[in-house]
UniProtKB/Swiss-Prot annotation:
One of its GO terms (cellular component) is mitochondrion. This is UPF0598 protein C8orf82 homolog. The lineage of its organism: Eukaryota, Metazoa, Chordata, Craniata, Vertebrata. InterPro entries: DUF4505 (IPR028108). Transmembrane segments: none annotated.
Length: 218
């Protein structure tokens, strides 16, 4: 079972839709019941992460700061075990899966499964980007040269753990702060060519672009 988050999830289940099988949006229409047991001693749960990096039960009627998961230990466990869903179940509608023993936790996302929410500064080491409410426990080195501003949807992306898709979305508030560091060339007024960071002028590599073939709507 998950770390002492049972009470957290139980509360979220109360706030979610009834436990009857329902249809959710996705590439295909699929029915499920939260906590269903397709096999003995196996449970399945279904989650959703929005563009702010907030995690919800997928069938929550209302998705806002009140209803999102906030338990740090739960979030760290959930996202540190996130992998592409190759289980043969719900792969099209829930492309990511977080396993905990015999518990399957399926995830779909508004944009990307990893959403960077905070830039953690430190006097002794390079800054790190924290994602999905995990603080220091869910953080990776900040690579300013690999920031990817996408003109198609006005969003900003950064490398993410490979197991979680390799590309993460930068939350809008943080993206706005970082945008002040961008330099735009005369030939490309909508897409920056360089970023100014810690006294350096750094060319943007744009190497993440091939990993985002279809930009989600703004």
């Amino acid at each position: 079972m998950w770390p002492p988050s049972g009470a957290v999830r139980n509360l979220a289940l109360v706030l979610a839709r009834s436990q009857r099988a329902r249809t959710c949006s996705g590439v295909e229409r699929v029915s499920y019941t939260q906590g269903q047991s397709p096999e003995p001693r196996t449970r399945e749960y279904f989650y959703y992460v929005d563009h702010q990096g907030q995690l919800f039960l997928d069938d929550s009627k209302m998705k806002n700061f009140i209803t999102c998961f906030k338990d740090l230990q739960f979030l760290v466990t959930f996202f540190s075990r996130l992998r592409p869903n190759h289980s043969g179940r719900y792969e099209a509608s829930f492309p990511f899966l977080s396993l905990c023993g015999r518990e399957r936790n399926f995830l779909r996302c508004e944009d990307r499964p990893v959403v960077f929410t905070h830039l953690l500064a430190s006097d002794s080491e390079s800054p790190r980007l924290s994602y999905c409410g995990g603080g220091e426990a869910l953080a990776i080195p900040f690579e300013p040269a690999r920031l990817l501003p996408l003109a198609a949807n006005g969003r900003l992306y950064h490398p993410a753990p490979e197991r979680a898709g390799g590309v993460g979305l930068v939350r809008s508030a943080l993206a706005f702060e970082l945008s002040a560091c961008f330099e735009y060339g005369p030939s490309s007024p909508t897409v920056p060519s360089h970023v100014h960071w810690q006294g350096r002028r750094i060319a943007l590599t744009m190497d993440l672009a091939p990993l985002l073939p279809a930009a989600p709507p703004p």
